[in-house]
């Protein structure tokens, strides 16, 4: 039974709210969904006979994501980890902890303006396979506020230096 619920969660992995999660956080989300279903439907046969079974799992996913994000959106880095934002070209490599913290603070403020509650934000992320345009725009705005051109050049130089000083792989 648990495997079936996990499969439904995995089938939703293309949703932007889930796609960007690191493996550990995704596993926690999956466990939250399975546990919630088991607690709500201790007799699995009742759950299995629901006509809207996948809709029920979707609703539980949204609830678990809302819980994961936190009441004040304090856990946005779990949904949009810095390294993934860096790979996507939104943030440069080599930002200081203060700059990363400022970025997430800015993003939190903009998302609060766009979505009144974490649940509404979660629904928006879950409904679309990609990041909603409004959220992507907010990310770009926050990145440009946090990273000055001089900081960008400095971060790029640091990343290049770090890459050049990394040990060679495969024995080369």
List the predicted regions and their residue ranges:
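Mature extracellular/luminal domains of secreted and GPI-anchored eukaryotic proteins, especially small
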Residues: 1-172
